[in-house]
Amino acid sequence: MLVDADVLAREVVEPGTPGLAAVVDRFGEEVLTDGRLDRPRLGALVFSDAEARRDLERIVHPAVRARAAELERQASPDAVVVHVIPLLVETGQADDFDVLVVVDLDPETQLARLMARNGLDREQAQARVAAQAGRAERTAVADHVLDNSGTPEELAAQVARLWPVLAART
């Protein structure tokens, strides 16, 4: 079973959710477009104001954790549950899991991919990266580190080699 914190972070602020209501209470109606969260607009606010980012995290992170716990409870007892948590270190969850695999890449590649994927300029991408734990912090908590500087196929090959090692632990 795969539990992806980024997917859950979107889910907990869908229209009609308590999460979206809390975001609107804090940031105002201007973060909405047609009743839905305007992520680029909210991103511009929170990545230029550390206190605003912390406020958003205080709203979203507990809701994501609760939803992740709910999904894990629904898994079969013999299921291997894989959590994808981009902000694992920042949210203090590194000790909550049996094994930690960090997918790592060099900072320049990280910036380039973030700019391409999200349509950000360099300054916006740097602000987002600066809000995250550093590379050394992430790799320090890892049991295994995968190199994501290559192609998706190369990363998939690393995962395929690691999976039997992880599966043997269950």
Label every model-predicted segment.
Residues 78-90:
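Switch II (G3) loop of P-loop NTPases
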Residues 37, 59-60, 105, 130-133, ...:
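Short beta->alpha linker loops
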Residues 1-15, 25, 29, 131-140, ...:
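N-terminal polybasic phosphate/anion-binding patch
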